[in-house]
């Protein structure tokens, strides 16, 4: 079994940069480990255009192409429904 790995993406929050980071570093995340995408809240704060769709758009696109990751609602909703700056940003590798 591979080591437990945590990758955190907290870059520019631009859609393109976030998607590139997800694609480049997701292979390092072992089964049962996490890839956290920071600051998806920019969409909720009305800054989606500034960030070309931002982290949430990148996450949605990444998940469509990578069914080995899921959004882990346990962490997204720990304090209430998406009560986090990392909206839909806790990605768990399931296989």
Please give the residue ranges for each predicted region:
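C-terminal substrate-binding/active-site "lid" region of AdoMet-derived donor-dependent transferases
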Residues: 5, 15-95
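A short acidic, Gly/Pro-enriched loop at the edge of an enzyme's catalytic core
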Residues: 1-7
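Switch II (G3) loop of P-loop NTPases
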Residues: 10-13
């Amino acid at each position: 079994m591979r080591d437990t790995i945590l990758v955190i993406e907290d870059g520019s929050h631009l859609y393109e940069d976030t998607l590139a980071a997800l694609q480049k570093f997701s292979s390092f995340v072992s089964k049962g480990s996490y890839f956290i995408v920071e600051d998806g809240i920019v969409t909720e704060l009305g800054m989606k255009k500034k960030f070309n769709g931002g982290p949430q758009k990148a996450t949605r696109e990444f998940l469509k192409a990578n069914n080995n990751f899921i959004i882990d609602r346990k962490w997204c909703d720990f304090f209430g429904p998406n009560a986090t700056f990392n909206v839909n940003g806790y990605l768990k590798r399931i296989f």
